Amino acid sequence: MTMFRSISMVMLLVALVTFISMVSSAASSPEADFVKKTISSHKIVIFSKSYCPYCKKAKSVFRELDQVPYVVELDEREDGWSIQTALGEIVGRRTVPQVFINGKHLGGSDDTVDAYESGELAKLLGVSGNKEAEL
């Protein structure tokens, strides 16, 4: 029984080390580097797919605030699938859209709409959230 337990522990340890090395290598992949560089280089970044209704909704929120996000349309890139995988490893979600403001992850479409409706998005961007108030 002790021998079986020792073998099980060794197998578990090997599996854990393998998993950690896979995650580490993915987190430092060219695609992960692209994601990180893009996020740090632009005030507003949306990782999107051109046909996605949730992505369109998130982009429309920024139009309402007269803001122009930097949009990465994953379906229009040869490396889009790999970028989406790297994005999922970085933020814990593979779904699109994924929105970043000032280098920080805001979330997806619902998170973006909620932040807009609460006024938090306007605060993060340093803009007025009420167009009528600007008149």
Curated annotation (Swiss-Prot):
Top-level lineage group: Eukaryota
Domain Glutaredoxin: 32-132
Compartments reported by the entry: Cytoplasm
SUPFAM superfamilies from the UniProt entry: Thioredoxin-like
Gene Ontology CC: endoplasmic reticulum; Golgi apparatus; plastid; secretory vesicle; vacuole
Disulfide bonds: 52-55
Gene3D superfamilies: Glutaredoxin (3.40.30.10)
Keywords for the protein's UniProt record, in alphabetical order: Cytoplasm, Disulfide bond, Electron transport, Redox-active center, Transport
Family: Belongs to the glutaredoxin family. CPYC subfamily.
Protein name: Glutaredoxin-C4
